[in-house]
Regions:
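Sec-dependent bacterial lipoprotein signal peptides
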Residues: 1-20
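Cross-family detector of peptidyl-prolyl cis-trans isomerase
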Residues: 20-340
């Protein structure tokens, strides 16, 4: 009953302020501001805004690296609208609760940039200054859900924005000034933690790229230009999530099997330079790290290539399985040509 009365009261007050907004318009966010203020007054009476005009409703201090305004944040978050509807999230538990869990989707911290014009102004206002390990639940008005940056907080109200009122429940996992060095440190930790895979034969001849032979007996023969070879491969993230494979059993074991796909060795078209390598009958281009792994290989060899995101999918990532700024691992085996 209280919830119904509260809702009726808010609707009444919102209609009143919107009515006033029709009579007096002083800027593109006049009605939005009145509506937002009415919602705050009803749901969080007595709370005061901070910074540019955000409202912190829960906060837990961290003890790790301090988030600065020109770097990269690893963060977990749940995003909702003012009604509590979840619009985005990073964790597996929320996906399961919503019935949207998918074994092929990456769940975990994602990278946010804190450089101006690359992050919502209100979100940057909330997280810059936090420390890794800290958590904050914050309400951000629609006019601060913009990538634009202004000198004064009043200027955000004066400029139109397509943003919506948003609630972030965000936890800072880590912060770095250099995402590339951070990725390299992630790779080197993975190598250190897996001595059963990496040995003295490992090659690191390019920044952010590591090649590890897996075969015991390796030919010294190299492939000639215009050669066609066949490979099986499996691609993984550092956390073990398999995002692509040519091997049917691996696909089934990792929940990404598709009956619409034909599994088995795929063709690689060799070239004069590693940038010339293409995949399949359609001559599809391949990411740099994948090509570099192949370029180090010899006939009938099995090997592993591990590389940072500038040699992979960079800041964009790829689909739901590969978030931006992700180091990748490819296990590749050169095999005989399949029989027709």
């Amino acid at each position: 009953m209280k919830r119904i009365i509260k809702t009726i009261a808010f609707v009444a007050s919102a209609l009143a302020v919107i009515g006033c907004a029709k009579a007096v318009q002083t800027g593109p966010n006049e009605a939005n501001e009145r509506y937002f203020n009415a919602w705050i007054g009803l749901n969080h009476p007595g709370i005061s805004p901070t910074g540019l005009g955000i409202y912190v409703i829960e906060e837990e201090a961290g003890t790790g690296n301090v988030v600065k305004d020109d770097g990269f944040v690893y963060a977990d978050y749940i995003i909702t609208d003012l009604e509590g509807n979840i619009t985005s999230y990073t964790d597996k538990e929320t996906a399961k609760q919503l019935g949207t869990y998918d074994t092929t989707t990456y769940y975990g911290a994602k990278v946010l940039t804190t450089t101006k014009n690359t992050i919502y102004a209100g979100l940057a206002d909330a997280i810059v200054g936090m420390k890794a390990g800290g958590r904050k639940k914050v309400i951000i008005p629609s006019w601060l859900m913009t990538y634009s940056s202004y000198d004064k907080k009043e200027d955000y109200l004066k400029n139109s924005s397509s943003g919506v009122n948003t609630i972030y429940d965000i936890t800072i996992r880590d912060y770095t000034d250099s995402i590339q060095l951070y990725e390299i440190s992630q790779i080197e930790k993975y190598i250190k933690d897996n001595p059963q895979i990496f040995d003295s034969r490992m090659v690191n001849d390019t920044t952010g790229f590591y090649f590890q032979p897996l075969s015991k007996d390796i030919s010294t023969e190299k492939f000639e230009e215009d050669t066609t070879i066949y490979i099986n491969y499996t691609g993984r993230l550092l956390n073990g999530l398999v995002f692509d494979t040519t091997i049917e059993k691996v696909a089934k074991d990792n929940g990404l099997y598709s009956s619409a796909r034909t599994y088995g060795p795929t063709k690689v078209n060799w070239g004069k330079e590693l940038s010339d390598l293409t995949l399949g009958s359609s001559n599809s281009s391949v990411i740099d790290g994948f090509a570099r792994t192949l370029w180090h290989m010899h006939p009938m060899e099995k090997a592993l290539g591990i590389f940072y995101s500038p040699l992979g999918y960079s800041f964009n990532g790829s689909g739901a399985s590969i978030p931006g700024y992700s180091p990748l691992i490819f296990e590749i085996e050169i095999v005989a040509k399949p029989e027709d």
